[in-house]
Amino acid sequence: NIQNKHFCDIWLKTLEPFGIQPRSNKYDLFITQNQEKFAKNFLSKYLNKKIIGINIEGAIKEKKIDFTQLKKILEGLFNLNKNIQIIILSSPKRYKYINDQVSDLGLKYVASSYLTETILDAAALIKQMDLVISPDTSIVHIASAFNIPIISIHENNLKSHTLFAPKSDHSITVFSKFSDKLEGYNVGKIIQNSIELLEKNES
């Protein structure tokens, strides 16, 4: 019975006919020492700050945080915790556009990530973060591999969420109003839940 199971558990069940028993259903993701060093060097200027990564776009164009909502989230987070640095993540193809948009915001506590040419470059950066906010499940899974606290934004579809939910020890999902698109989610919940996860991680 695969009802109400996460997709990783469904795939692991395919090993049963071969007599293979998985030791864990946690993700593994391997990055190079150079990738990790580069990420640490990039973040070193934000020493003692809580690092929040926000991925604003997904592989599916409907799964995104628009810049009006993003600005509300950014300002709301900073109003509640001044000791943060927010890094905006983007795909290589969208890097220049998003970097320009972030620059136009003029917020000192917000910066674009460096150009991540591969998904493992992005993973190395995510590994160093204290919290990740994302509407895209691929970034959620990367953060889960390193047990980074996660705020995921998901369409109001519990079956889909069960399949692709975060697997970090600490995660909260904010749902949209619709089952097929990310519209009408509560920005205030994203802000408040983010601060709660940061505080929980400190304790």
Where do the protein language model's features map onto the residues?
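Catalytic machinery of carbohydrate-active enzymes
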Residues: 1-203
